[in-house]
Regions:
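Bacterial signal peptide processing site
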Residues: 27-30
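Bacterial N-terminal signal peptides that target proteins for export
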Residues: 2-15
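Mid-length scaffold segments of soluble, non-membrane domains
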Residues: 88-165
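Post-signal peptide N-terminal segment of mature Sec-exported envelope proteins
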Residues: 34-64
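C-terminal motif of bacterial Sec signal peptides marking the signal peptidase cleavage site
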Residues: 22-25
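A structured, mid-to-C-terminal "fold-capping" secondary-structure block
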Residues: 34-41, 144-246
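Membrane interface segments of multi-pass transport proteins and intramembrane proteases
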Residues: 64, 70-81
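Terminal hydrophobic membrane-targeting helix
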Residues: 43-44, 78-85, 102-103, 107
Length: 246
């Protein structure tokens, strides 16, 4: 079933409310201390007070819900059933990755995403749970980056986690234009996001624990790690030239 505008409006209002809440809780620049001011500008986190509150709430949800679910999946779920489930979830991201690869002018990755999507289903039905083609993950935030848009201020989104102003608008864009979202019911999109979150969390349980244990400031460590990972994703692990927006 296609989404209608009335289905989407509540999400617009929710995002507007969250953004306004962040804007009313901006950090105050330390204007009298040059070193502190340099650190403040480097962090590019003017919404830090609000971001830290959201971060604390996200950590609580993770510890109460997501982490226990991910541990159960990792330790108790039958290993032979994990590959087909994880590959099915991954393949549901390929149409969006195909779209953004085209928008970025990357025909090679567009072909990889399309090939992965269209060959995975028949091979899955024939019993091959490990497709030969590697997945490609692209999103609107990466497309905006390739078009030359800067990251902008750091933003911590409820439940979604670390983001930037650019990637926040990208998340909204993907919600509207995700091909899977347009041709399926909302529960399918929610199920994909939930399943992906559980699988990803099950793969980094020990790493997250180490980061929490060894970080003087867990929030700042997550912020730094997120930015490094996003830069790597934008470059696809290498150097990506900036393309003009169409």
């Amino acid at each position: 079933m296609l989404k209608t505008i009335t289905d989407l409006k509540p999400s617009r209002f929710l995002f507007a409310a969250l953004l306004m809440g962040a804007l009313t809780a901006c950090a105050i620049p330390p204007s009298d201390d040059k070193e502190a001011m340099a650190e403040f500008e480097k962090a590019n986190d003017p919404f830090e007070p609000a971001n830290r509150l959201v971060f604390a709430a996200n950590v609580a949800v993770d510890q109460l819900v997501l982490q226990p679910t991910a541990v159960t999946y990792r330790d108790l779920f039958p290993n032979e059933l994990k590959p087909p489930i994880e590959n099915f979830i991954t393949n549901l991201f390929m149409p969006l990755s195909f779209l953004h690869s085209l928008l970025q002018g990357d025909m090679e990755r567009a072909n990889m995403a399309a090939t992965r999507f269209f060959t995975a289903l028949p091979t899955f039905l024939l019993g091959n749970t490990m497709p030969d083609k590697q997945p490609v993950f692209e999103d609107a935030g990466q497309t905006l980056a390739v078009w030359g848009f800067e990251q902008g201020p750091y933003v911590m989104l409820p439940l979604i986690g670390p983001s930037s102003l650019r990637d926040t608008f990208g998340t909204i864009g993907d919600f509207f234009f995700d091909p899977v979202g347009w041709v399926t019911d909302t529960p399918v999109t929610i199920g994909r996001a939930t399943g992906n979150a559980i699988v990803r969390r099950s793969n980094n349980i020990d790493q997250v624990r180490d980061l929490q244990r060894n970080s003087l400031d867990y929030y700042a460590a997550v912020r730094s790690l997120y930015r490094q990972q996003r830069e790597d994703q934008v470059r696809n692990g290498g150097s990506v030239p900036v393309q003009p927006a169409p």
